[in-house]
C-alpha cells in the first residue's frame, strides 16, 4: 500500500506560498500539457511551465544549457526579475511545477488543504471498509 505522497506542487497554490499571484494564476490556467522538463533555469532537469524562455533554449542552433550550478549564472538575474516584475515577465518566468498542475485550480489556505486531505482520506477509508463488508 501507499506509504507516502509527493505533494510539492500543491504548496505553490496556497496563500502562504512565497511565489507571486501572477505565478499562481499561470498554474491555475495550466494543464499537464503546458509543462516541459528543461535544464534552462537550473542546469538540472526540472519540470516547469513552458514559455518563451524554455522554447528559446530548445530551439535548434541555440546553445545547450550549462550544468548546475553554472546555468543559474545565466538565468539568476532573469529569475530575480520575474519575482520583482511578475506582470511584465510572464513569458519568461521560472514556474517549476509537476504534471499535477492541471488539478490545481484555486489558491487555498494551507489549513484548508490539510482539512481537505483529511476528509478525502477518511472518505477513502470508508469506501474501503464498505468493500470489506460486502464479502
Give residue spans per PLM region:
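Conserved active-site-proximal phosphate/metal-binding subdomains
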Residues: 1-135
Amino acid at each position: 500500500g501507499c506509504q507516502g505522497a509527493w505533494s510539492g506542487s500543491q504548496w505553490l497554490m496556497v496563500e502562504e506560498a512565497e511565489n507571486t499571484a501572477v505565478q499562481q494564476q499561470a498554474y491555475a490556467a495550466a494543464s499537464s500539457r503546458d509543462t516541459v522538463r528543461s535544464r534552462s533555469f537550473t542546469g538540472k532537469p526540472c519540470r516547469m511551465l513552458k514559455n518563451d524562455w524554455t522554447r528559446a533554449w530548445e530551439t535548434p542552433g541555440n546553445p545547450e544549457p550549462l550544468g548546475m550550478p553554472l546555468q543559474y549564472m545565466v538565468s539568476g538575474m532573469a529569475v530575480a526579475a520575474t519575482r520583482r516584475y511578475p506582470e511584465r515577465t510572464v513569458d519568461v518566468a521560472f514556474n517549476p511545477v509537476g504534471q499535477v498542475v492541471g488539478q490545481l485550480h484555486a489558491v487555498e489556505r494551507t489549513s484548508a488543504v490539510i482539512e481537505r486531505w483529511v476528509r478525502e482520506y477518511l472518505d477513502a477509508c470508508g469506501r474501503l471498509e464498505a468493500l470489506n463488508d460486502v464479502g
